[in-house]
Amino acid sequence: MLNTRLIAMSTSDGAPETKKQRPESSSNGSKDQNGTEAGAEGDSRDKVALITGITGQDGSYLAEFLLKKDYEVHGIIRRASTFNTTRIEHLYADPKAHKGGRMKLHYGDMTDSSSLVKIINMVKPTEIYNLAAQSHVKVSFDLSEYTAEVDAVGTLRILDAIRTCGMEKNVRFYQASTSELYGKVVETPQNEQTPFYPRSPYACAKMYGFWIVINYREAYNMYACNGILFNHESPRRGENFVTRKITRSVAKIYHKQMEYFELGNLDSKRDWGHASDYVEAMWMMLQRESPSDYVIATGETHSVREFVEAAFKHIDREITWKGKGVDEVGVENGTGIVRVRINPKYFRPTEVDLLQGDASKANRELNWTPKVTFVELVSDMMKADIELMRKNPIA
């Protein structure tokens, strides 16, 4: 069995039918979905993976996943006054000293081509997972240029760095795409052939990333895939995302640390899955004989309102909704206390009301299906935040 190691990299901090596929180089040493070596006979090279965004939700779960498969993990973080490594510190043998184990961190940045070239040339990866992004939709309206630099041009920089290093025939590339590409949806559910209609600077930047991956795949015979991932959450989700805001707030209410919290559009519906399920799909995409693009989703939709109700149900409380529009409130049954209020500042300039994915292609070709249900997802997040607020009320 081949030895494996992982080089990981972090920066900021989570389709139409693919055109014709190209045959891949036999030196890639990939595995099919059953774990069988594909084209690796006589290839003694270690399998090396490079992940951008290792300090984020998806990057940390992917690092864990690959470590369990005996990968060695190296990570690159942006230079800053403080380390942003909370999600991966447990992967060190000595978390306080950031030493030991099979993971090391290095410095790099998605906005700096030279650092990408140096890293790729040094580690000579066989797999690259591009997870780094400014991924908050509402923030992208305020930081539109930065979002484009990281999410759009950053993807181009990595692809060009691969070619600069002369490794386009030896590297398998995964691009983290997003269901936000569908935006103002033209059909439900959305699959790989559904037209895009992006509704935010984030989605527009990701759309460029999506198409430049396909362009490089066809122009340079690269093994490059887009994973169109629908919303996926976990206890490691960023605090500024609505799902984590809900579970943190309900946990504070449970501990009597907060009376109510504010939200925006309660009726926005999303296809929510668990991040741990979705990183497995990323890996599966790079183990096939030829590259393609895949929608990864649960196929179920739930509203923000339902997420709130499920979170309160976890602490044995029920919410009744009263009023309309910005005057609507969520009232706790029994006590009559208002627990949820609407604040227009949380509305997006252009809303995306409904996203629901059709992952039948991934199920058919990758043998991938989600394992964690919506209720289990909310429960997992609630348990973690209740414990977090118990230990640190000001977290």
From Swiss-Prot:
pH sensitivity of activity: Optimum pH is 5-8.
InterPro entries found in the cross-reference section: GDP_Man_deHydtase, NAD(P)-bd_dom, NAD(P)-bd_dom_sf
Region of interest called Disordered, as start-end residue ranges on this chain: 1-44
Annotated active site: 178, 180, 202
Catalysed reaction equations from the record: GDP-alpha-D-mannose = GDP-4-dehydro-alpha-D-rhamnose + H2O
Record flagged with keyword NADP: yes
UniProt keyword annotations, A-Z: Lyase, NADP
Record note on temperature dependence: Optimum temperature is 30 degrees Celsius.
Domain of life: Eukaryota
Role, per record: Catalyzes the conversion of GDP-D-mannose to GDP-4-dehydro-6-deoxy-D-mannose (also known as GDP-4-keto-6-deoxy-D-mannose or GDP-4-dehydro-alpha-D-rhamnose), an essential step in the synthesis of GDP-fucose from GDP-mannose.
Family, similarity comment: Belongs to the NAD(P)-dependent epimerase/dehydratase family. GDP-mannose 4,6-dehydratase subfamily.
UniProt xrefs under HAMAP family: GDP_Man_dehydratase
Protein name: GDP-mannose 4,6 dehydratase
Organism, scientific name: Drosophila melanogaster (Fruit fly)
Name of the gene encoding the protein in the UniProt record: Gmd
